[in-house]
Amino acid sequence: MVQLVTERDLRESLEAGLQETLPAGWRAQFSPTSASDDPQIDGVLDLVAPTGETSQAGVIFKARLEPAQISRELPWLTKYPTSLVVAPRMSARARSLLNDAGVSWYVPGGDYRIAIRGLFIERLVQQSKRRSAGAPDTRFVADLFAGGALRVVRWLLIEPGRSWSVGDMAERTGLTLGFVSRTLKTLARDAYIERVRGATRLTDRDALLDTWAAAPSPPQSAFERVATVDGPEALLRMIRAFTTPSPYAVTAEAAADKLAPFARFSRVEMYVQDVAGWDRALGLTTVPRGGNVVLIKPVDAGVFDGSFERDGVPLTSRPQLYVDLVRRGGAAAEAAAFMRERGALWPQ
């Protein structure tokens, strides 16, 4: 898609695009505003329904639009009953912020969501393209929810009320200062955090957690096993009794049951580094599916970050547990919602 950067190009593209997308019988006319009118908008869009009813929206053209910019400008973006923002590109995060604020948006030649009184039109087909790790622009990380960047995200969610310096986060995650700095810049760009005089604070923990849960799952190996024990609680007692030098952490329904009991669970899932060691310790038998034990060997060792004990059993961090439950869907996702509603996700 051609990147339009001038107001004139954006205006002409909007006018042409509306002619193609408006329902039959609808008409639209754009009128630019002068400096003496309202300096906060670039024009007014008049929409005429087939019934003759007219509605208006203030139009704002942006050559560049980042989520952090939207957060700063929301007070005047929502000043009018209806507003329409037009920009050559909009990230998923930018669109989400505008949707939540009730602001319509339009990407020339791409997607749009316009809700102005009796008119609602939407096109959501284009997938945002992720920048490859080798792309020239290295001010930001390519993916917040993979690799080292996810370790930063995870710690922000584990301690959402804490103020972090770059050095603090680098020490906690074991990442370089430069990589941590780029990750925090990306989070600030996407309006998840605020950075003031070297201090970083999480400002939208719910949106960050939900975006992580919706991101693709990392590649990891899950091994189905059967343990000949009398129920999952007996299995947890065996796990608790086993001494191992390598880290492990229980996740999914078995872990959620320790924090916010929701429903009976029949199997135990756990992150481990030594699969063979656990096979021997618990006398596990390999099965293709339907086991009562699942040993997950993660590619990302960050799944162990922030793990804690409950009833003598190490559990993965609360944010990691929530994401794991949501991604499993079904009853597990319901358990995640229950955990959040009960305040077990971020206890006071």
Regions from the language model: what does each represent?
Residues V196-F223, A227-A234:
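Extended amphipathic alpha-helical segments with heptad-repeat/coiled-coil character used for oligomerization
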Residues P39-K79, S83-V86, Y322:
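Conserved catalytic cores of phosphodiester-cleaving nucleases, focusing on short active-site segments
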Residues A149-T211:
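Loop-centered beta-sheet repeat module
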Residues P219-G302:
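Short gly/ser-rich loop at a beta-strand->alpha-helix junction or flexible surface loop bordering the NTP-binding
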